[in-house]
């Protein structure tokens, strides 16, 4: 038997907590036997004194075990259970292609995703743009679609990781969100509750990233890779670029359209293709579905080219309540905004840099994102045909196309887009889409 205040005192004094102490405290978060004040105090103690790797693993696994841990054995799946998670960005539509692509290569992808908050878009919000799609299906339907289709992308259910929900809301209100240890446990407890065989982690870097610097992003990536592998899930973290919009669009319905165009081959943005392939290939390697990266990429290109990945996306949508002909006739089902109009550059030159966070906030201003949890979204609005860094532009070249519901909203977004995309006299140096892979062997 432990006392919550003694656990707080120990961490306040910079000492390491035992796994038993951490389990006791997390159980108290779940059962409400630990007060909000005590949770806030421990969060602040961890923020200032940090946790070693053993503590991080203990916190992550205790939070994972605070609720239901999914069990796939009873389904008799004939392939590995694999997934990816992103720290969030702008125009990050990867999950919509990656899930069906990995499933088409023999994996099973039970992806539990979140909604957008702040400048980053949420995967669930994109699916909410699809008429009829159930982002909160019953456990039975979720398992049925995973088994029969190979992929199901849904929202977090109430019985998964209840400790994280309470801990996170208190961290958000007490300025301890930025702790690497607590971020690691929050992200991984949700993913590990899905009982994965392997995980690819996408940690964003740059002006649209969650972490403020490359160094902070790398520290988070290393922490996640070390803790996940330490907890028994094969994991690789990728550091990927978010100094510009990842797809050529940002929003909800507009990103669904780009995902379908990617899967069918109608249009594949080169940067989006590179990051999607990098993450998906890593999932196949970790899951034992490919012998090396070249083999993984060949398999992924095959399921794109033969239409199998697009077919599975369609089956997932219809299996979760959406239209059966969604892939073939998506324009019939996706909402469209009243005003669709380009924004032009004020001067001749090159797209030199981008404040990606501000572009994400422009989508929020249009109504496509949340200022606070619970806000209602307009799924039709957003940006399309966003220029890429290095593109040559002039006063007749659109740097983006705005999808808005009113002239006032368009005007506000136009100002934001012009301010966020900086035009220079020369083209910037090209940066890689993927900066680094952090594998278990690198830790």
From Swiss-Prot:
- One of this protein's Pfam families, by short name? Glycos_transf_3
Q: Which InterPro entries match?
A: Glycosyl_Trfase_fam3, Glycosyl_Trfase_fam3_N_dom, Glycosyl_Trfase_fam3_N_dom_sf, Nuc_phospho_transferase, PYNP-like_C_sf, PYNP_C, Pyrmidine_PPas_bac/euk, Pyrmidine_PPase_CS
* Molecular function terms from GO: 1,4-alpha-oligoglucan phosphorylase activity; thymidine phosphorylase activity
Q: Which GO terms describe its biological process?
A: pyrimidine nucleobase metabolic process; thymidine metabolic process
Keywords in alphabetical order: Glycosyltransferase, Transferase
Give the protein's function: The enzymes which catalyze the reversible phosphorolysis of pyrimidine nucleosides are involved in the degradation of these compounds and in their utilization as carbon and energy sources, or in the rescue of pyrimidine bases for nucleotide synthesis.
Family recorded in the similarity comment: Belongs to the thymidine/pyrimidine-nucleoside phosphorylase family.
Name listed for the protein in its UniProt record: Thymidine phosphorylase
Provenance organism? Shewanella baltica (strain OS195)
Give the gene that encodes this protein.
deoA
């Amino acid at each position: 038997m432990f006392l919550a205040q003694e656990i707080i005192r120990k961490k306040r004094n910079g000492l390491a907590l035992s796994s038993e102490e951490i389990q006791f405290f997390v159980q108290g978060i779940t059962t409400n036997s630990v007060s909000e004040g005590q949770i806030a105090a421990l969060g602040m103690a961890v923020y200032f004194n940090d946790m070693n790797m053993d503590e991080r693993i203990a916190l992550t696994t205790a939070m994972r075990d605070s609720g239901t841990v999914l069990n796939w054995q009873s389904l008799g799946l004939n392939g590995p259970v694999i997934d990816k998670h992103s720290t969030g960005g702008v125009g990050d539509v990867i999950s919509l292609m990656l899930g069906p692509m990995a499933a088409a290569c023999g994996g099973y992808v039970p992806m539990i995703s979140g909604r957008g908050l702040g400048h980053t878009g949420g995967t669930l919000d994109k699916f909410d743009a699809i008429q009829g799609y159930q982002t909160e299906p019953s456990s039975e339907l979720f398992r049925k679609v995973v088994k029969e289709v190979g992929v199901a992308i849904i929202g977090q259910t109430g019985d998964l990781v209840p400790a994280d929900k309470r801990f996170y809301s208190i961290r958000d209100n007490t300025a301890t969100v930025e702790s690497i240890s607590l971020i690691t446990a929050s992200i991984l407890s949700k993913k590990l509750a899905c009982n994965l065989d392997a995980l690819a982690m996408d940690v964003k870097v740059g002006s649209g990233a969650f972490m403020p610097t490359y160094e902070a992003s790398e520290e988070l990536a290393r922490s996640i890779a070390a803790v996940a592998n330490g907890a028994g899930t094969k994991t690789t973290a990728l550091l990927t670029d978010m100094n510009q919009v990842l797809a050529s669009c940002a929003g909800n319905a507009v990103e669904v359209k780009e995902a379908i165009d990617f899967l069918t081959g109608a249009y594949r943005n080169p940067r989006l293709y590179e990051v999607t392939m990098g993450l998906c290939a890593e999932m196949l390697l970790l899951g034992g579905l490919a012998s090396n990266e070249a083999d993984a990429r060949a398999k992924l290109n095959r399921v794109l080219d033969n239409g199998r990945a697009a077919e599975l996306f369609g089956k997932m949508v219809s299996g979760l309540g959406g239209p059966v002909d969604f892939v073939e006739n998506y324009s019939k089902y996706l909402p469209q905004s009243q005003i669709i109009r380009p924004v032009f550059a004020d001067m001749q030159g090159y797209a030199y840099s981008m404040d990606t966070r501000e572009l994400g906030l422009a989508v929020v201003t249009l109504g496509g994102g949340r200022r606070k949890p619970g806000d209602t979204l307009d799924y039709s609005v957003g940006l399309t045909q966003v220029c890429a860094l290095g593109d040559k532009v002039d006063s007749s070249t659109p740097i983006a196309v705005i999808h808005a519901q009113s002239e006032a909203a368009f005007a506000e977004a136009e100002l934001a887009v012009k301010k966020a995309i900086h035009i220079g006299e020369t083209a910037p140096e090209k940066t890689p889409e993927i900066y680094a892979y952090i594998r278990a062997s690198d830790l």
